[in-house]
Structures are given as structure tokens and as C-alpha cells.
Amino acid sequence: MEFVFLGTGAGVPSKGRNVSAIALQLLEERGQTWLFDCGEATQHQILHTSVRPRRIEKIFITHLHGDHIFGLPGLLGSRSFQGGTTPLTVYGPKGIKQFIEVALSVSTTHVKYPLEVVEITEEGTVFEDNEFYVETKRLSHGIECFGYRIVEKDIQGALLVDKLLEMGVKPGPIFKRLKDGEVVELEDGTILNGNEFIGPPQKGRIITILGDTRYCEASRELAQDADVLVHEATFAAEDEQQAHDYFHSTSKQAASIALQANAKRLILTHISSRYQGDTYKELLKEARELFSNTEIATDLKSFPVEK
């Protein structure tokens, strides 16, 4: 599991930062990539990374402001042009389906893969399979905006091979049957219950990716005990009132949410273009004063998520 930040700026592109898009690479877990927001020129940013459009399985849109969706029609079309045939699902607020349909229709773009658009109308679980589930809550922004909590389900423990070898059980197909929890009878009549030869389960990871938001309780709830919290930091602490007026957060408020939620790690993004060059490091300094395990994303930077 690895983050690749494709765009980390706020509102409009700048020389140093493109607008919002985050890839969550789940190559080891499911051989796919999930994308969170898709601002203008996202597909161009992708060209500079290991992200492959054909591997994008899901796109989660936080809200319908242009800096979060204007790259979507182009990416959907290019995925088809590049030979993508596997299904893709887009999740987002009401209106995202109309936006996609109109853009593709007017431009006569025909995608050659199954494309599903799921409009989120209420909070709760928007996706679940045997590996992950994704929950969402409304945030505090100028228009309807959602944050996402991605929960990896606990992973089955490893087969206790040494224990089996000590009992004289030789490696072979029987190991798989025991791993699957079957009850197996050996040639000498010994009965083995596979569940007794499985180690403790490995705790799944929790990832929280928030859209644009003021400091709010929903952010804390989504981030509770997260291994990684990705939070916007549009403004510095001295501009807290301005952040509130424009429905955004400061770096210090992001750190406060991480602290309250008992998150393990905080990554700041959605940085205003007023912070050019190294001036953005002041945002990082302010956040670390409150929550030390904070990093700030820059375009094309990757962040592995350890198990």
C-alpha cells in the first residue's frame, strides 16, 4: 500500500503544485489503484509516476468543485484509449453522474469498459468486499463534501509451519487444507484441526482521506485510530479566521484532529499557492508543534503505508 500524491495545491494550479488528486496504490493487496479526486491535468501528472490508468479500479470524489473534478473526463477517456477494459466505479456527491455523462457525451468520448457511477446521498458504507470497506461522512465545506475512511479487514494469520514440522507433518497439499481451516486426518489416524495451526490475525490498516473542510467533528470521527490521516492545510494558523470563512482548515487544526483521533501519522495537502518555495515548511512546523508525526505532501511524492 502506497500513496502517490498527484496534486497537492488548493483552488488553482501553481508552478509548484497541481490541483487535488491522490492515488492509493493497492498493488500487493488487490493489484489495483484507487484514486481520490481528479483535478485538472491529473492524467498528465500520472505520466511522471508508476500509476497506470488501466489499473485504476475506483475513483472517490470528495466534492464537485472544479479543482477536484475537472481532470475526470480526460482520465476516463484516456483509460479507454490506452486499452483499459476492466470495470471502473466512480463514487461522489449528487451531480457527479450528470457531470461525467455530459462531458463524455458532448465530447463524443466512448469508454470501452464498464463504467459505474455511484452518487452518495447519505453517510455510511459506500463499498465493501472481503478485503476492504469504505465509509463516508459529510464534512463542513461550502458545498456538499465527503471524507472517506478506508478500512482494511484483518488478515488471516500465517500457518504455523514449524509446529506442523515438529509433529512430523510433511509439506504438501495438506498445508493448504489446514491453512483453509479444514479438519484433516493423517495416515496414522491423527486428526488435525486447521484452526489450531493458524497464528493470530494481522490487524488491517485504516486510511482516512478528507476533502476540503473546516475543523469539524466528522473529521475526527473519520480519522479515529487511523494509521494515516490525509488532511487539508490550506492556511497557516495566523489565518484561522480566513480558513473558517472560506470553509477550509489550518495546518494546526489538521494536527489537532490527528491528535484527538489518536491517528498514527498525518500527511498535509491542499496547500494554498501563497506558500511558494520553502514557505510551506512553516505549515509543517506549526503542525509538528502539536502532532510530531506529520509530513507535508508535494506533487509526485510517494508515502508507503507499512503493515
UniProtKB/Swiss-Prot annotation:
Record keyword Nuclease present: yes
Catalytic activity: Endonucleolytic cleavage of RNA, removing extra 3' nucleotides from tRNA precursor, generating 3' termini of tRNAs. A 3'-hydroxy group is left at the tRNA terminus and a 5'-phosphoryl group is left at the trailer molecule
MF annotations from Gene Ontology: 3'-tRNA processing endoribonuclease activity; zinc ion binding
Cofactor stoichiometry and binding remark: Binds 2 Zn(2+) ions.
Top EC class for this record: hydrolase
Keywords, in A-Z order: Endonuclease, Hydrolase, Metal-binding, Nuclease, tRNA processing, Zinc
InterPro entries the record matches: Metallo-B-lactamas (IPR001279), RibonucZ/Hydroxyglut_hydro (IPR036866), RNase_Z/BN (IPR013471)
Binding site for Zn(2+) 1: H63, H65, H141, D212
tRNA processing is among the record's keywords: yes
Transmembrane residue ranges: none
The EC number(s) this enzyme carries: 3.1.26.11
Location of the active site: D67
Record-linked SMART domains: Lactamase_B (SM00849)
Gene3D superfamilies in alphabetical order: Ribonuclease Z/Hydroxyacylglutathione hydrolase-like
Required cofactor(s): Zn(2+)
UniProt cross-references to Pfam families, sorted A to Z: Lactamase_B, Lactamase_B_2
Binding residue positions for Zn(2+) 2: D67, H68, D212, H270
Family classification: Belongs to the RNase Z family.
Function: Zinc phosphodiesterase, which displays some tRNA 3'-processing endonuclease activity. Probably involved in tRNA maturation, by removing a 3'-trailer from precursor tRNA.
Quaternary structure note: Homodimer.
Protein name: Ribonuclease Z
Organism: Bacillus cereus (strain G9842)
Lineage, highest ranks first: Bacteria, Bacillati, Bacillota, Bacilli, Bacillales
